[in-house]
Amino acid sequence: MKNTLIASIVATLIAGASFAEGTISGEVSLDFAEANDKIGGTMGLDLGVDVSGMATVDLDFSATDGNAVTLDNWTVGTQVGALGVAFGDDNGVMPGAEGEQTLAAPAMTESLAVTTGAVTVALGFTDWTTDITDISNVQGAYTLGVAGLDVTAAADYNLDSENTVLGAGVGGLDLGVAALGGAMTYDVDAEVFGFETVATRGGLTAYLNGDDTNLLQNVGGEYEMDVAGATFAAGANYDVDAEDLTPTASLSFNF
């Protein structure tokens, strides 16, 4: 019964794609980062295929200089009344932030996600190419508005390890001088509470994070601006414990 249900949902997603219209977008970027006390650069190409309509298709391709184009993420979905269904490898619902060095990040590879209203539930597969009945983990999230804030509560349960990770995200707090948000996670088995606070103003984004055993571990930020049709971004992360500053910079062109 479970095999038939999952196979039927996937077939519906594929069939619905023929009724949609798509667009292709791309970005060429020059990225620079510090490693081993030296600054190195790479040229990257990102291509996106987005289809919307009765069905949705999202394909994200990337390549670097001298390497083949690879498919990084893909999602195929459809909407049936108030019910949204998506199948792909980009359906994780745990809250994220900017640095994310101290947040628990349960793996979610290929998965089947069902959304209705503000609720999303995703079933992750161990290896969908060999057995679509082998479920590795289950994630769920609920988003609501509270006093002008966007609040998300989420959880991940791993069926193999029987571990649970709880998560929460908050955004939309306008302080006038900046907008404030953040995320937090709690790993039940590890008994670790991680958090990150993010502030944004215009093209500037700053963050700090830590956990309940070490409150301040990383401080970082990035500034992004338009330069003659291109986007320039410069940022850095400072590891407080290692006393290590890691700068980054990029110049990207969208088409």
Each language-model region and where it sits:
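Outer-membrane beta-barrel proteins
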Residues: M1-F255
